[in-house]
């Protein structure tokens, strides 16, 4: 039987090919006692996010935030999935991510996502400030993302 690392790499390969279902199937082949390892759980989360399975992704992301509090991307995933899961909301996503600004002050994606949430909640002045913060940290990346991001449409319309 191939080692867990083989299945993990195969799952990541399927994900790169855009096939979240095959990636999840590959992860199921990992020995049950190793499936709870953070690396396997993180790969599972990536699959769930790619497959837009928000109801499953949100609690897994929350668990990974607790297990690996130093990993900023788990908080970003948790907020993103919490917004989109059944019964989820922008407010929930905002409440998850806002405190992370202090913990990860150099992470521009936190400011960017908060700007999106604020904009969607029609808190445009705050969204503008948050986007400016993200721009200070990342500049061109933020400009490219913000130009097409539907979440920021009302902020762009206001600027025109």
What are these regions (language model features)?
Residues 2-33, 43:
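Alpha-helical segment of the N-proximal tetratricopeptide repeat
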Residues 5, 9, 43, 77-79, ...:
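"A position-specific structural signal for the A-helix of alpha-solenoid helical repeats
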Residues 18, 52, 86-88, 122:
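Residue-level detector of the short coil/turn that links helix A to helix B
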Residues 34, 68, 104, 137-138:
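Alpha-helical junction/boundary sensor with strong preference for TPR arrays
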Residues 39-50, 59-109, 116:
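Alpha-helical adaptor scaffolds
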Residues 45-50, 79-85, 141-159:
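TPR/TPR-like alpha-solenoid helical repeat scaffolds
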Residues 67, 119, 124-141:
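TPR/TPR-like (Sel1-like) alpha-helical repeat modules
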């Amino acid at each position: 039987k191939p080692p867990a690392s083989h299945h993990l790499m195969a799952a990541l390969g399927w994900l790169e090919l855009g096939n979240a279902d095959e990636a999840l199937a590959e992860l199921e082949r990992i020995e049950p006692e190793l499936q709870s390892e953070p690396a396997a759980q993180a790969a599972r989360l990536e699959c769930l996010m790619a497959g837009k399975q928000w109801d499953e992704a949100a609690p897994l992301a929350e668990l990974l935030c607790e297990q690996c509090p130093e990993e900023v991307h788990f908080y970003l995933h948790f907020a993103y999935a919490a917004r989109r899961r059944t019964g989820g909301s922008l407010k929930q996503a905002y409440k998850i991510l806002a405190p992370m600004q202090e913990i990860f002050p150099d992470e521009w994606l936190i400011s960017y996502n908060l700007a999106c949430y604020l904009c969607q909640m029609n808190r445009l002045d705050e969204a503008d400030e948050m986007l400016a913060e993200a721009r200070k940290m990342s500049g061109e990346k933020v400009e490219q993302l913000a130009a097409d991001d539907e979440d920021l449409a009302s902020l762009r319309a206001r600027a025109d």
